């Protein structure tokens, strides 16, 4: 039960946190950017805690692929930019360069682009006053208004760049770009007019070209690319959810780049590239494929905290503690020490890594949100940190804040984490199908020989126990969309796809379904078909809201979690029992909720023990709270 929506210390470091943990660090200076950049990819292949193999998805190309986080490959990428950035490289038969950055959502494609431009190849673009200096235009499709067409947005962005550039907007350069047209007009239809009249008509002509945008941009860019290089960078295409729009951006970008002899750098999801890799538009380019593997999220967060600490050093401030006292801080960077010490190398840090599923952008957002709302006793934290030099903030508060995000109660539609207890199929018998299928695939992944499981196998086995193909398809699509599973080939999930579980899927099936905080959050958005159980949960929730005694309230919360868990176990049991009757392999017969019951009892016992230890005066009689020690 959340009684406080904001962390009392957040305002002291809010600006620095928002900047350092921003989804985009585009506006950081060169030094700060270099401090934030992580060049070490995630290499985990086996998670010992849940004893599951972490599968890897296949490459989208069989040929050579450069690794963006590999030192040798990075140098080769730099060499490519330098070669194409040389003066007067555009000979008649030369194809423009096309670089495709392929990676999963949040893998760091945008960060890699800015790192290359700001740090590794900055000298190529340093002298803007030189006509032969190459050009770099970064177009972010998150800035594209929905009513604007793709082509119009690209052309308007190029025009804005032209207007800002001291050389491209110069009247002499504009005249040179339109020289042939101007001379043709003068000697043709305007030959009878006076010089003043000719200049007036030519001005009208140029202004008309400018208003129409495309012909003006075509002339200016075509002229500059005769003598130097122009790199057009199309970014954040993968943030657009509609595949059709992604596909059109892909083809339109290639078309414009080919027409204007631009070097194209395009960020894409692998799935979008697969759909178009045989497109005729691609044949016009010399291809370089750069694979951006997700960096270690723990390293990313560590560097962001280091940047926050650097920016807050020697700043003073104060906040109102939970007891109403005003706490003054001579150096608010010690708050960063408390927070980072509670995240890095801790269970909280591991949870963020797992829940983000290699999505750095999501990991940064979750960290930012739980720091804003996740803690209720910062005064106590500061006091203990001053006395002992270390303090670990409560992990359950952080975990709840991560699950809830900006909301007060959990809803799958707003949370970054999906609900495994409700498949949303509108059939009570199929309510736990999402968790059942996930547990089966995670069980297979516990075998060292596991590589993948085919969708045809999943469909066949589920048919055996009475699950229709339509339900199977919907669940597989959901599990992939919710990041519990991945398709090996990056394509859409179908019966012909092969699947591997994500690390998040493994933790859901093997740990989180018996976690008290997780259960409490999930039950708020789970359908309860059994009227008796629903009535009990409703009554307990009402009593919890009105109860003021902390231990009584926690005891009732434990009882509510148990009732919910037992109801979910009853719903999944028929699927497991049918698999046993039909003689399916052991992976299909295991009941994850029954198997996790000992861990649930241990978890709830820990919660009750912690409540007594923290909130109950020693002289009180514990029996009056009716604590159920046998859970």
Task: Indicate where each model-derived feature is located.
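Walker A/P-loop-proximal flanking segment of P-loop NTPase domains
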Residues: 1-127
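Winged-helix-like regulatory helical subdomains adjacent to P-loop NTPase cores
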Residues: 30-34, 45-53, 345-348, 358-453
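P-loop NTPase catalytic cores that bind/hydrolyze ATP
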Residues: 109, 143-161, 228, 342-381, ...
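Alpha-helix-centered segments that form part of catalytic cores
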Residues: 193-221, 325-354
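The catalytic "switch" region of P-loop NTPases
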Residues: 219-233, 237-342, 388-392, 401-403
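P-loop NTPase nucleotide-binding core
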Residues: 47-62, 91-234, 240-242, 299, ...
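Short acidic, S/G/P-rich loop/turn micro-motifs used as interaction or catalytic elements
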Residues: 107-108, 143-146, 237-244, 272-273, ...
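Terminal-proximal interaction/regulatory segments of ATP-powered molecular machines
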Residues: 439-631
């Amino acid at each position: 039960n959340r009684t406080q929506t904001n962390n009392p210390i957040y305002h002291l470091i809010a600006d620095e946190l928002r900047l350092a943990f921003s989804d985009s660090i585009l506006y950081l200076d060169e030094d700060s950017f270099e401090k934030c950049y992580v060049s070490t990819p995630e290499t985990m292949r086996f998670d010992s805690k849940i004893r599951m193999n972490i599968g890897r998805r296949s490459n989208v190309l069989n040929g050579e692929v450069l690794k963006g986080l590999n030192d040798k490959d990075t140098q080769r990428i730099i060499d490519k930019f330098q070669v194409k950035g040389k003066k007067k490289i555009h000979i008649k038969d030369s194809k423009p360069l096309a670089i495709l950055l392929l990676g999963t959502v949040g893998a760091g494609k945008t960060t890699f682009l800015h790192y290359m431009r700001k740090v590794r190849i900055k000298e190529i673009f340093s002298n803007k006053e030189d006509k032969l200096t190459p050009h770099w235009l970064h177009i972010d499709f998150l800035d594209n208004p929905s009513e604007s067409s793709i082509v119009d947005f690209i052309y308007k962005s190029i025009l804005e760049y032209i207007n800002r550039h001291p050389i491209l907007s110069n009247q002499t350069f504009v005249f040179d770009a339109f020289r042939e047209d101007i001379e043709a007009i003068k000697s043709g239809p305007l030959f009878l007019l006076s010089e003043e009249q000719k200049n007036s008509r030519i001005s009208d002509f140029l202004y008309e070209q400018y208003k129409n945008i495309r012909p003006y941009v075509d002339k200016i860019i075509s002229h500059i690319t005769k003598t130097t290089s122009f790199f057009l960078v199309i970014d954040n295409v993968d943030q657009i959810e509609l595949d059709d729009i992604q596909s059109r951006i892909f083809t339109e970008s290639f078309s414009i780049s080919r027409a204007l002899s631009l070097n194209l750098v395009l960020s894409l999801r692998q799935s979008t590239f697969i759909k178009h890799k045989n497109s005729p538009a691609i044949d016009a380019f010399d291809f370089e494929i750069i694979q951006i593997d997700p960096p270690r999220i723990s390293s990313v967060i560590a560097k962001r905290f280091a940047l926050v600490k650097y920016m807050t050093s020697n700043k003073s401030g104060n906040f109102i503690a939970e007891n109403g006292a005003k706490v003054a801080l001579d150096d608010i960077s010690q708050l960063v020490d408390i927070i980072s010490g509670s995240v890095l190398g801790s269970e909280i840090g591991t949870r963020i890594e797992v829940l983000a599923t290699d999505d750095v952008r999501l990991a940064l957002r979750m960290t930012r949100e739980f720091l804003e709302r996740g803690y209720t006793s910062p005064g106590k934290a500061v006091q203990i940190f001053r006395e002992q030099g270390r303090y670990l903030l409560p992990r359950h508060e952080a975990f709840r804040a991560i699950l809830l995000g900006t909301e007060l109660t959990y809803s799958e539609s707003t949370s970054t984490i999906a609900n495994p207890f409700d498949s949303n199929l509108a059939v009570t018998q199929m309510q736990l199908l999402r968790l059942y299928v996930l547990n089966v695939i995670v069980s297979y992944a516990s075998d060292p020989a596991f590589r993948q499981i085919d969708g045809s196998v999943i469909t066949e086995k589920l048919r055996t126990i009475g699950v229709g193909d339509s339900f199977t398809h919907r669940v597989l699509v959901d599990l992939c969309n919710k990041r519990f599973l991945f398709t090996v080939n990056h394509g859409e999930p179908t019966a012909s796809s092969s699947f591997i579980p994500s690390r998040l899927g493994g933790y859901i099936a093997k740990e989180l379904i018996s976690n008290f905080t997780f259960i409490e959050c999930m039950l708020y958005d789970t359908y309860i078909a059994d009227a008796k159980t629903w009535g009990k949960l409703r009554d307990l929730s009402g009593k919890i809201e009105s109860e003021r005694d902390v231990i009584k309230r926690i005891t009732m919360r434990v009882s509510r979690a148990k009732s919910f868990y037992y109801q979910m176990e009853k719903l999944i049991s028929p699927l497991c029992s049918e698999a046993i009757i039909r003689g399916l392999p052991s992976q299909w017969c295991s009941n994850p909720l029954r198997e996790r019951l000992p861990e649930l009892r241990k978890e709830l016992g820990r919660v009750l023990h912690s409540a007594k230890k923290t909130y109950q005066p020693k002289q009180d009689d514990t029996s009056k709270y009716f604590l159920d020690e046998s859970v």
